[in-house]
């Protein structure tokens, strides 16, 4: 009923995004990429395979907040709440090692179009992920038909931008481990030049006159590392960071722009509430109650 299959990406595609992509991710999340890199390179499976992760992503609750297990769409009672999980580092496309934005969006679209689902609660707990993963959520917000409440533990970097893009209300699920912020962008890569030189391998690159700007940042880094990095900041990282900051300010018009709020610092739940970064601290049941109230208000407005 609520199942969907997704063709997971092969090793080459995952490695390409890890090694060449830009990231909306916390420092701890960035360190996790080393583990994923090791896992991917040691795994000999290169064939794309079909899998189903819908059961771990999507649950349904009736209007009394009791979890239900409908076997078909017709068994979903009117006024139900859909609960979707968005947990762990994220790329744009799902793979064996990371959740994909495409998987979460597939479930959001599914419940967004179910008549008997009144509202959506999305549980967010992650350090961030690839910059490319945010666009599908921004696009979903344009076709959203129902209220969305985000309840979060770690809501950092990409996982901070996601609720800002799609949620009507944002909550922390605790005031102990919950963290918010890390609003910023980072580019990370590994330079294996010296390693290859010690192996006696020399890499040559030849460009025609018609490709004078091809790989210009990488070429500049090789010639003058700081100059090349400044080009990367100016041409790629700063524009992304500015869009991230603008999205945060749009989602939170009363945000207190204290030191670090928009430049990468992280905050606990109570501080996030004080800064108007989130609305409140509460439980999953309370998030569902808020979602139900929003749905009722939405229906009144629509009927009038």
Residue ranges, per PLM feature:
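Small-residue-centered hinge/linker elements
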Residues: 1-146, 160-251, 294, 301
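Assembly/oligomerization interface modules of large self-assembling protein complexes
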Residues: 142, 156-158, 228-304
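Acidic, His- and aromatic-enriched active-site or binding-groove loops in soluble protein domains
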Residues: 153
């Amino acid at each position: 009923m609520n199942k969907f299959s997704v063709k997971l990406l092969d090793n080459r595609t995952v490695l390409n995004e890890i090694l060449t992509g830009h990231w909306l991710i916390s420092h701890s999340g960035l360190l996790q990429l080393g583990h994923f890199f090791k896992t991917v390179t040691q795994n000999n499976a290169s064939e794309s395979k079909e899998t189903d992760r819908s059961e771990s992503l999507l649950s349904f609750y009736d209007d009394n907040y009791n979890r239900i297990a409908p076997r078909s769409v017709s068994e979903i009672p009117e006024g139900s709440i859909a609960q979707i999980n968005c947990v762990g580092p994220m790329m744009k496309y799902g793979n064996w090692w990371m959740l994909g934005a495409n998987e979460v969006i597939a479930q959001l679209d599914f419940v967004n179009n179910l008549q008997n689902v009144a509202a959506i609660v999305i549980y967010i707990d992650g350090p961030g992920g690839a910059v490319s993963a945010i666009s599908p959520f921004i696009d979903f917000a344009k076709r959203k038909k129902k209220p969305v409440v985000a309840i979060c533990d770690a809501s950092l970097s990409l996982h901070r931008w996601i609720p800002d893009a799609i949620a009507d209300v944002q909550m922390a699920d605790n005031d102990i481990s919950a963290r918010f912020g890390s609003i910023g962008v980072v580019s990370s890569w590994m330079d294996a030049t010296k390693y290859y030189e010690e192996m006696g391998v020399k890499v040559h690159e030849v460009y025609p006159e018609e490709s004078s700007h091809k790989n210009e940042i990488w070429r500049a880094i090789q010639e003058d590392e700081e100059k090349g990095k400044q080009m990367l900041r100016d041409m790629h990282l700063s524009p992304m960071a500015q869009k991230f900051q603008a999205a945060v300010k749009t989602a939170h018009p009363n945000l207190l722009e204290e030191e670090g709020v928009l430049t990468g610092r992280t905050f606990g739940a109570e501080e996030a509430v004080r800064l108007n970064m989130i609305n409140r601290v509460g439980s999953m049941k309370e998030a569902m109650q808020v979602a139900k109230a929003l749905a009722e208000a939405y229906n009144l407005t629509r009927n009038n």
